[in-house]
């Protein structure tokens, strides 16, 4: 991996973590073409932490409000003042995030099953997952607009969104896209659905990183901390720009374009993957691999 590769991966992670197009799927496809191997895990963790920082910066007032409500809730429980029915938006959203996140706990025991699709030698599965994401986006665009805000969310809403987040562990299924779609299906307003989706990503990203970073550091792969630092900064900076873009697209009601994008990308991945399986060749971008593939081919011919 070189500096160009880590910058490209940082840009991809920063954009696709928040745009409803699947960051894991894009990184899996990019790593497939760039022929990145053993250091993929630690790189993925660092890039995800970069986007985590972007969420904290972009939604700090709401996140801080939820943190305060967490401690106030504990106080109310011990003083007998807690009421499930009478909660403000931050407190109710805090509980809904906890419920949705709790659904990931048993699923993470099977994390190797999900990550195995990123480490295989083809991108056909990612292609079908991209198409699944496109279907969700098209369906959510056609559903009746809801009027339910954060203070009106129910446990059933959190369960439905949490279940969709579990499905999004597959590379190619957009976490933000699928959870936003689930929120819209539950009758949430677009702003509430998107805000909840982004904040819900915090414990998911943080928990996944904590579980994976131990395994990554135990590996014998030599790490370039300068490159990883660059990737972290790039993913955080691009992530902030992506969040601003999503907010703008939300106002303009243009999420449908991501459905077309993921559908086309999915078909392309399936086509390329099928070609690679049929021919035994792997298509890679030579300028990203320092022309190693062409040099090897030329050497064999001479």
Predicted regions and their residues:
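Multi-pass membrane proteins that catalyze or facilitate reactions on polyprenyl-/lipid-phosphate substrates
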Residues: 1-302
